[in-house]
Amino acid sequence: MAPVVTVPENASPELVEKAKNLASVWQLNFDGNVRHGLVLMQSEAHLALKQLDEPKVGEVLVDFASDALTFRRLHGGGKKEAVAKAVGLKGQSEWRVLDATAGLGRDAFVLASLGCRVDMIERSPVVAALLADGLERAHHSAELSAWLPQRMRLHHGIAVDLMANWCNEPANLAPDVVYLDPMFPHRKKSAAVKKEMRLFQQLLGPDEDADGLLAPALALAKKRVVVKRPAGAPFLAQQKPHIEMQGKANRFDVYLIN
């Protein structure tokens, strides 16, 4: 069951109306009086996923101007960063990348900051609403507004279907790279899972149909498909990649297109 959209206590009529419109756009329910459970909280500042029963967990939002992402953008290693190497950005600029499992959009943002034009697909209306809110606020950011709107686009829908439709478009519109980072079930011993992962798992659960993403991705991409997996996780669809890039916590499996 999807969380309801709500507002803080004593919200202005304008904010209530904004929240109701948001609920309508994403086909979610609005309840201005809810005080328990997992909600989408529309405040004056931003939209956030929040567990009202666990105030210590904090909230999850998309903030492309956050200190963490700003540091990563400015000092994260640029094209030497692992995701950039996996995508194959060395010597390339303005590659088209399709992030078919966008989530909170962090890897998409890093790739966009390096010059890629990134289309993001997100099937969850709740997560898509968070992404849309983050993109909207980025449009008004002095540091981001000059380039981010031209390089990041959001599509809400089922990735397998959208990729299949994309294959029917002219070849010049196909992405150079399809990037996949499906939700993977966390091991039980990982009690200190990051707050957003806890809330995301509560909201979405693991991508049980993730294996079905690989074939349409391989059919669509012009250069390569990159799959981000936890270290030690099986290959997607049990298909061995051409390149494995091992990290401490994650692994990038790279499938080259001949």
From Swiss-Prot:
It comes from the Bacteria. SUPFAM superfamilies: S-adenosyl-L-methionine-dependent methyltransferases. The keyword Iron does not apply. The gene is rsmJ. PANTHER family: RIBOSOMAL RNA SMALL SUBUNIT METHYLTRANSFERASE J (PTHR36112:SF1). It is found in: Cytoplasm. Keywords: Cytoplasm, Methyltransferase, rRNA processing, S-adenosyl-L-methionine, Transferase. Belongs to the methyltransferase superfamily. RsmJ family. Its EC number is 2.1.1.242. It catalyses: guanosine(1516) in 16S rRNA + S-adenosyl-L-methionine = N(2)-methylguanosine(1516) in 16S rRNA + S-adenosyl-L-homocysteine + H(+). This is Ribosomal RNA small subunit methyltransferase J. Specifically methylates the guanosine in position 1516 of 16S rRNA. Signal peptide: none annotated. One of its GO terms (cellular component) is cytoplasm. GO terms for molecular function: rRNA (guanine-N2-)-methyltransferase activity. S-adenosyl-L-methionine binds at R106, D107, E122, R123, D181. Transmembrane segments: none annotated.
